[in-house]
Regions:
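Short coil/loop residues immediately preceding or within conserved phosphate-binding loops
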Residues: 79, 138, 143
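Conserved beta-hairpin
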Residues: 78-98
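A glycine-rich phosphate-binding loop feature that marks nucleotide/adenosyl-phosphate handling sites
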Residues: 29-31, 71-80, 179
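Structured core elements
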Residues: 83, 93-95, 142-147, 175-177, ...
Length: 352
């Protein structure tokens, strides 16, 4: 640990901008119009006070921001910094990196697992894990960080930053990868990014699952990526993603592409909801039915997500939802299924 007032610690913090102060946004400044511009690497070097203000935003917004990010920002020609100002105060910034445009031999090596070129997370993931080589040939801007001044949050500045950044930085598509949470995901969904790859393990630093999202127009491969995402993450809900929070599942379900389903016996499901049959005999149909109807639902109850989609045990559900045991859990499941049937007013053709 540093001694109180240690001169070396003070020097280190000053050089690496680790304790730069965020200026307050005065009321008169908050009324000024926003201005958006590129903050180039030469400008970062020539204007250290301005750089310190921008980097303070990044440190404040992202706990993993480190001196390595500062070095990359100043040295990596593939990186860019885009800022928003109100008066003299930086109220938002986007840090992004250029990816893609890889040649055919490199893409083939990526798909065979023999190469993983540094600085190309999105195209490598798409080519290696989804088998989409076209995305690796195309150009991409990946958003590494986006930060908004604490005094100016919940005012749409982040969305405006993205809009202006995309307008001024052409690419075939745009991407972002982050530790998914119920607070962050709605922002990216609202800005027309779609999920295409959900990690199977929680990040040790953030404690969250990593989610890769993309945005682009006229992408021949995007529908394929969405279908693969839908099949993969739903399949993993009962295995590697069993601990994924129901609130995040609720937010992801509307992005799920409806996959072909067998004819679903709704009469059997309704009879179960009213007390007939047993859970094991209808579980497969409940699973297929929820997946078929999920894209049209505004929300799905955490209990149905946990029991039917994540296939948790009765005991685990009882503990999670503070119910006494299997009988009480199953009764709650039946009640919610019946309510869902009534609300949806399903019109499937039923087999006899």
């Amino acid at each position: 640990r540093w001694a109180a007032g240690d001169a070396l610690e003070q020097w280190q913090n000053q050089v690496f901008l680790l304790q730069s102060e965020l200026p307050e946004v005065a009321l008169e400044q908050a009324r000024e119009p926003l201005s958006f511009s590129l903050f180039s690497q030469p400008e970062c070097v020539e204007q250290p006070e301005r750089l310190a203000q921008v980097f303070a935003l990044l440190v404040n917004a992202h706990y993993q921001t480190s001196p390595n990010d500062l070095f990359a920002l100043l040295q990596d020609e593939a990186m860019t910094l885009f800022v928003a100002y109100q008066g003299e105060v930086c109220v938002g910034c986007v840090l992004a990196v250029r990816e893609g445009e890889l040649d055919a031999p490199t893409i083939e090596a990526i798909q065979l697992g023999t190469r993983r070129p540094k600085g190309h997370l999105t195209p490598v993931t798409l080519a290696n894990q989804l088998g989409i080589s076209q995305a690796a040939r195309q150009s991409c801007w990946r958003i590494l960080r986006i930060a908004v001044h604490p005094d100016c949050q919940r005012q749409g500045i982040g969305s405006q930053l993205l809009t202006h950044f995309i307008a001024q930085h052409h690419a075939d598509y745009y991407a972002t990868s982050f530790g998914v949470s119920e607070d962050l995901l709605p922002f990216w969904l609202a800005n027309h990014f779609v999920p295409i790859k959900l990690g199977s393990h929680r990040d040790q630093a953030s404690g969250c699952y990593s989610l890769l999202m993309v945005r682009g127009e006229h992408l021949d491969w995007l529908e394929q990526a969405k279908q693969q995402f839908s099949a993969h993450w739903i399949f993993e809900l009962s295995d590697s993603l069993q601990a994924l929070e129901p609130q995040i599942i609720q937010q992801l379900l509307p992005s799920t592409v409806a996959l072909p389903q067998p004819l679903i016996p709704l009469e059997l499901i309704e009879r179960y909801a009213r007390g007939g049959a047993n859970y094991e005999s209808v579980a497969v149909w409940l699973y297929a039915w929820l997946l078929a109807t999920a894209p049209s639902l505004e929300s799905l109850s955490p209990l149905l997500i946990s029991k039917i989609l994540q296939r948790k045990s009765w005991a685990a559900c009882a503990e999670q939802f503070q119910l006494s045991g299997k009988r009480q859990v199953e009764q709650a499941v039946r009640t919610e299924i019946l309510a869902l049937l009534v609300n949806l007013q399903c019109k499937y053709t039923l087999p006899i």
